Structures are given as C-alpha cells and as structure tokens.
Amino acid sequence: MASLINQAAWQPKARTRSLQVGPGPTPSPNEHEIVIKVAYAAVNPTDWKMQDTPYFELEYPFIWGTDVAGTIVQLGSEVTQFKVGQRVIGHCDSLLTRKVTNAGFQLYTTVREILVAEIPDSLPLANAAVLPLSVSTAASALYVQLDLPFPSLSPKSTGKRIVIWGGSSSVGSSAIQLAVASGLEVVATASQANHDLVRSLGASQVFDHRAPSVIDQMASVLQPGDYVVDCIGSPDTQAKCGELVGRIGGGTLPVMLWPQGGLPQNVRAVFVNGLDPGMVNLDVGNAVWRKFIPEALAAGKFQAKPDPRIVPGGLEKVQEGIDMLRQGVSAQKIVIEISRSE
C-alpha cells in the first residue's frame, strides 16, 4: 500500500512544556504489529511526568502517548486475528521500545498485536480511548502481582475481598471491573461525589477516603488473606494502604508509585508496571486483551470509565490536554480528538 502521511506532536527536548506538531514517522509494522489511524488519544499522568521529570534518558525529539482508539489501516504479516477497517483500542508502548512509531500522539501509530482489542460499534471511540493503559496496569496489579484468577464473563466466587483504593480513578475503574470478573468482592474508596459511579462499576461497599476513620472502617470488613491495591500512587495513599494490609495480617501491596519505605514489616509493596502484560507476562496479555476485554465490551459487561473529557482540535491540542491533567481532574480522563473518524 502507499506510504501513510503521518503527523505527530513532538517533544523537542527534555523538560519542556511545549510540544511541536510536525511530520511524523512513517509506519512500517513488523510481523506482529498493527497500524492504527488514531481518532482519539487519552492523556495519562505518565505524559506530564515524563515531560517534567523523565524517569529515564530518552533520545529527543520524542513522542508521548499510550492510549489510543481508532481504525486499523495496516497489518503485520503474521497478524491473523484482526482485519483492516476494524475499530480498536491500543496500548502504545514507546516508553518500552524507545521507538516513536509506537507512540500515541500521532495520526498513525504502530501497536503490538497483543495490546490491541476490538471494540463494539456501540462504544464511541472517544469513550474507548480511556481504557488501554488502565486495563494493562490493573491487569498487572491483579494477575501478575497478586496472581488472581483470570477474568471471566461467568466468574466463580473466590470468597475473597479486595480493596481498590481510588475506585473512581482510571486504573481504579478498570481494577474494580476486572476484580469482579475474577470472582472477588470489591471494597473501594472514593470521594462522596463518586460513590454512585464506583458502585455502578461493581463495588459492593464504598468508603470516603477523606474520613479520619477510613482505615478502621475498611479493616472491619476485611479478613486475613484479603487484598489491597493502591490505584492512586501517592506517598499518602501508599502509607494508608500499607497500614491497612498490615492490619489484616500482611501480604503483597501493588502500588503505582515506587515503594517509599516505612511500611509495616509484614507488608511487601511492589511497583506495578503497566507494560508487563505485553512485555513479560504474555499469558496475562492474552487472557485480558485478546480474550476478556473484547468479549466483555461486546456483552456490555465492561464499562469504559471514567468518562472522557474531550479536547477537540487535533494534535495541536495535546499540550493543552497534558497541562489540564497536570492541574488535576476527578472521575474524568482527558481525551484528545486527533482525527475525525465517526
């Protein structure tokens, strides 16, 4: 096929808050990659954190972006599960590969097949764009770090409860739904305004994370062997989740921030790598991305939450979206309209 004419929002150098829109890399998928024309791309905390204080060295100019929704335009030679024209979501992993072709903030991105999922026609692309990184991160916490049963449309009860701290967050929204689909009863935290949202995702009990007695309240409904996941990733939430795990006998605590220390001796905090399902634990990627997510979305048993806060205007608006998230949002995800596809 003819070469695709690409455009991208480039980070010209480290530690600058000014993306530059210009010609993007020409997609050339390997045998297991898929080229997606991006309709919408979501903004994640990683984008502004990498812009302000990179976790590691990169060669610049670079392109950010991990969450995309759009239409397949090209397939690698060994890709058999998908076809050109399908509506899909994709988890872009340029921070792993260090290749700008694998980034999300561009008109055409190249994504590994294991991190692509078909979406039903009933799900708007803008809503679908909130899912990729949150699904991968939640899956890593639940199935890599905690070794829970893989999700199913007809789960069997495990008799266990799991605390999802930050239930209305992007990762928390996916974690609640995956945990329920794995046969666990979910206990979550959220601000009072978001309790109904969190219950609609499947949480049986919701506690106000601001309540002074929240640890006591939650510990009273848990037993040794139950689980806790910190989906917020701040020093404060890590400390509170660590205290809660310690109160119920100890165990593994998946966290979204590097372990800070100072936790009870019976608590082992482990950092959750959202790239894991497509990088190391491919059985998790296959179980979640290839099997469960497409089936659950089609059956109406998985919601694309939180709702998107759409920023129209194309690639020129990516920096604006990053700045908006840097200032903070609640129960929403910033989604940039990259191109008009529906």
UniProtKB/Swiss-Prot annotation:
Alphabetic keyword roster: NADP, Nucleotide-binding, Oxidoreductase
Lineage of source species: Eukaryota, Fungi, Dikarya, Ascomycota, Pezizomycotina
Positions of substrate binding: L133, S134, V135, S136, T137, A138, A139, S140
Alphabetical list of SUPFAM superfamilies matching this protein: GroES-like, NAD(P)-binding Rossmann-fold domains
Pathway the protein takes part in: Secondary metabolite biosynthesis
Organism per entry: Aspergillus japonicus
Assembly mode: Monomer.
PANTHER family xrefs: HYPOTHETICAL OXIDOREDUCTASE (EUROFUNG), ZINC-TYPE ALCOHOL DEHYDROGENASE-LIKE PROTEIN C2E1P3.01
Pfam families according to UniProt: ADH_N, ADH_zinc_N
Name the UniProt record assigns to this protein: Trans-enoyl reductase himH
